[in-house]
């Protein structure tokens, strides 16, 4: 294997209403967010909650045809993805492709929080 998984980077949670979800995570669970960000390319607005070496990411679609809106229509609100941190993203993508893993992106794509 040409790469190493080093940790869980974040868990992405699809929500219909970011403000309502933020209230739960902030007021009920007592977490502090690290700000809000819009990623126009992905048609999504996000908030991250740092938790130790990982984060929770809340994602709300900014467009009815965005990937998060489609996910919620199909599966409802909840965990949409788990992002793993690797030591070499390019090597990881090439290795996974070679092993027949279906990839959403074959090259790193930068998202919220500078994630690729």
Segments (PLM) and residue ranges:
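Mid-chain, well-packed structural core segment of small domains
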Residues: 71-101
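Conserved secondary-structure micro-motifs at functional edges
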Residues: 58-66, 76
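N-terminal beta-strand motif that seeds the catalytic metal site of vicinal oxygen chelate
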Residues: 1-20, 77-86
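Short, conserved acidic/polar surface loops in the N-terminal third of protein domains
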Residues: 69, 115-116
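A short, polar/proline- and glycine-enriched secondary-structure boundary/capping micro-motif
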Residues: 28, 67-71
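Residue-level signal for pocket-adjacent positions within structured domains
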Residues: 66-67, 105
């Amino acid at each position: 294997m040409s790469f190493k998984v080093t940790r869980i980077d974040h868990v992405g949670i699809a929500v219909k209403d970011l403000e309502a979800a933020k209230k739960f995570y902030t007021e009920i669970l007592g977490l502090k967010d690290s700000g809000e960000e819009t990623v126009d390319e992905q048609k999504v607005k996000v908030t991250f909650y740092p938790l130790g070496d990982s984060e929770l990411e809340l994602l709300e679609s900014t467009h009815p045809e965005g990937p998060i809106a489609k996910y919620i229509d199909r599966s409802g609100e909840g965990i949409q993805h788990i992002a793993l941190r690797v030591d070499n993203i390019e090597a990881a993508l090439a290795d996974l492709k070679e092993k027949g893993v279906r990839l959403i992106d074959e090259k790193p794509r930068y998202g919220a929080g500078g994630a690729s």
